[in-house]
Amino acid sequence: MSGELEAKSRGDTQSHEQKLCYRWTISNFSFFVEETEEYITSLVFSLEDNDKMTWCLRVYPTGVDEKNKDYVSLYLILLSCEKGSVWAKFEVCILNAKGEKCNTERIPSFSRIQPHQPFGFEKFITRDSFLSPAQVLTPDDKFTLLCKVSVLQDSFSISGQNPRPAIKVTRCTLENDVGELWENPLFTDCSLLVAGHEFRAHKAILAARSPVFRAMFEHEMEERLTNCVEIHDLDPQVFKEMMGFIYTGKVPHLHSHSMACDLLAAADRYGLEDLMVMCEDALCRSLSVENAAHTLIVADLHSTEHLKTQALDFIIVYASEVSKTSGWMSMVESHPRLVAEAFHSLASAQRVFWALPFKQLKWSLRPTQL
């Protein structure tokens, strides 16, 4: 008598999926749509826990080739990875002036992507769409894209004799739990005095996060003996934001230019390198005609070379507008060396003008992402 054999053992092959989300804003986009340049490239971005796999977005405002000249083309490009290729899928959409998603395009199934192989849409959106810019651009002529990428990580197999019910692994709450320590004075062992305000904290956390605090509590200093630290020349609200970062790794108010500048100074003072990078990134993104000169001063003061380069590049592009601002006038009086650097950069750019064709010149001067 024949019959089906019963499986006495089993095996499961599983794959882990990692996701990232990247937002890219291009200023003065209608300018690019009207021109016949080749493409604009975003900054490099990566997964939070895998900086060896890097990506960028590339937009062709007048189409990737002649047959697509009536469209804006958009591609995701894998720049580097530890292996020869990755399996990924992605979707991208436009964020309009109201922050609403529109014109969503997606590649729904996982595809093998090779480094530097364009992966995307040759007909992402028609150029005619920009004849009614309110549909796709903000009032200040910014074009914002939101890109979501899913990457299939290595698969692994699990074997077993008898099926067992799956165990649901709960989300790790460490970040929130440590954040609660900052909100709750229970078990604190030191005081931080800032302009008449007292903040309670934990020496172990301060020492683990900041080399400056560690030195205070390690050596025979007054702070170690009294468990009290007096903080001078720091606004209480800025200090509170810095402490929130120390406990949670988050900074919710970096959208404010003044807060980002003050936090950059505090991060430099207390050796918080990750916070410095976050502030530098926020200040790069918020560069404007009004704050460019002040941003250059801040970047120079705290030796943030990337921010300084971005500020100088911005001033070169908008030299006539920036030179009329109160910030520039103030910098002429207080930091003549930086004014000289800006003029030197501008002179170098003008030399490029005579050495390059007009189209190539424009791309060498104008930032692709502000």
From Swiss-Prot:
One of its GO terms (biological process) is protein catabolic process. It comes from the Eukaryota. Residues 188-251 form the BTB domain. Residues 19-149 form the MATH domain. SMART domains: BTB (SM00225). Signal peptide: none annotated. Belongs to the Tdpoz family. PANTHER family: SPECKLE-TYPE POZ PROTEIN. This is TD and POZ domain-containing protein 4. It comes from Mus musculus (Mouse).
